[in-house]
Amino acid sequence: MSLNLSRLSLLSSPRISISTHAPRKGYVCCSMKSYRLSELSSSQVDSLKSRPRIDFSSIFATVNPIIDAVRSNGDNAVKEYTERFDKVQLNKVVEDMSELSVPELDSNVKEAFDVAYDNIYAFHLAQKSTEKSVENMKGVRCKRVSRSIGSVGLYVPGGTAVLPSTALMLAIPAQIAGCKTVVLATPPSKDGSICKEVLYCAKRAGVTHILKAGGAQAIAAMAWGTDSCPKVEKIFGPGNQYVTAAKMILQNSEAMVSIDMPAGPSEVLVIADEHASPVYIAADLLSQAEHGPDSQVVLVVVGDSVDLNAIEEEIAKQCKSLPRGEFASKALSHSFTVFARDMIEAISFSNLYAPEHLIINVKDAEKWEGLIENAGSVFIGPWTPESVGDYASGTNHVLPTYGYARMYSGVSLDSFLKFMTVQSLTEEGLRNLGPYVATMAEIEGLDAHKRAVTLRLKDIEAKQLA
């Protein structure tokens, strides 16, 4: 679905028109519409920051019967849907990780995943908070303590691309948090096996079970539980519209399961000035566009000195040689460029758009970090492509999309924890605080609340008089 921008005024100057000239697969990288922020009304800017609407009504109609079937028939339903959708016949739906050996990988591949593991582990371990206890009044002590979520489900997509990096991003914080049961769901290969890179990452990061299924049936199996799949209490991970719909339905069902965040197509917003390399700008835009035809790609140009022709040529050149260039082409067809007078206007628009990924590729990029309010993850400076965060810098790549960065955070260690508050009062504490509580309870007309305090205060007073 493309973004409806028909009521916005296009720039009078030529659009960025991108063509691959001699495409290998019969596709053409489409043009990106262009707009000048200073010429748009506030309502037009609001339209520009809106994402394509997803009509979930038809998707729910498909997903609901799958969820019901898995609830009723468990593993058999998972097998049936896996054969129908993935053309794979499963003998076994769930693998116990303790029974699987660590797969052999090429040394360079193993080293890459090991470096990523170490960086992701270090960054998420540093998120552990120390327990703090506060004495608000004499004898009144309060604290907040954390506990791991007992069982979690991790969804690792396997549709248009295999994503072992997502296994690391989800399993490592679960491992650090101390989640006892960690179920990783991922579509099986045609022979019913698990992608060896995903298996390696899962073993390294402490996954306890692998559910060899994808789509809505995998989400339902983790939410309800089956004979072989443990029921989980929270489900994490990106997926297509059917996966997203299943998560939305199940979090509001009798399954009593929560989810990480709402999800939409992946997206990037790049802010660039005349100091940014056109080669890097093009590469960053295309690295997001290649995710899929529904990816959202936005370029914000600062000032009038950016060489748009050079960017056009680079996008055409790089798109032409990409194996997934057809996906990139379709994504670019509903993407756009906006022109900002300065960095203040550029960042103001970015904060309105609230991108999943925000790249700041301008001179002295670091000094603008303090103005950024809404973004899933930020990449600052010419040497920080989005790819490093996607794979191995240490930050998490499971992030809010679709503008949800205005109110949601990406996956972190806290996502796998729950927090309890604890309070304890001494006799002196209740003498100090109790009368105020009794007064407030009386104002609200809750006499039992009041008595729970006053009965104790009377006993304390009686002991003192004895």
From Swiss-Prot:
Pathway: Amino-acid biosynthesis; L-histidine biosynthesis; L-histidine from 5-phospho-alpha-D-ribose 1-diphosphate: step 9/9. Binds 1 zinc ion per subunit. SUPFAM superfamilies: ALDH-like. Its EC number is 1.1.1.23. Zn(2+) binds at residues 288, 291, 390, 449. Catalyzes the sequential NAD-dependent oxidations of L-histidinol to L-histidinaldehyde and then to L-histidine. GO terms for molecular function: histidinol dehydrogenase activity; metal ion binding; NAD binding. This is Histidinol dehydrogenase, chloroplastic. Its main location: plastid. It is found in: Plastid, Chloroplast. PROSITE patterns: HISOL_DEHYDROGENASE (PS00611). Residues 1-30 form a transit peptide. The keyword Amino-acid biosynthesis applies. It comes from the Eukaryota. One of its GO terms (biological process) is response to UV. NAD(+) binds at residues 155, 217, 240. Substrate binds at residues 266, 288, 291, 357, 390, 444, 449. Keywords: Amino-acid biosynthesis, Chloroplast, Histidine biosynthesis, Metal-binding, NAD, Oxidoreductase, Plastid, Transit peptide, Zinc. Belongs to the histidinol dehydrogenase family. The active site is at 356 (proton acceptor), 357 (proton acceptor). InterPro entries: Ald_DH/histidinol_DH, Histidinol_DH_CS, Histidinol_DH_monofunct, Hstdl_DH. It holds the Pfam family Histidinol_dh. It is an enzyme of class 1 (oxidoreductase). Its cofactor is Zn(2+). It comes from Arabidopsis thaliana. It catalyses: L-histidinol + 2 NAD(+) + H2O = L-histidine + 2 NADH + 3 H(+). One of its GO terms (cellular component) is chloroplast.
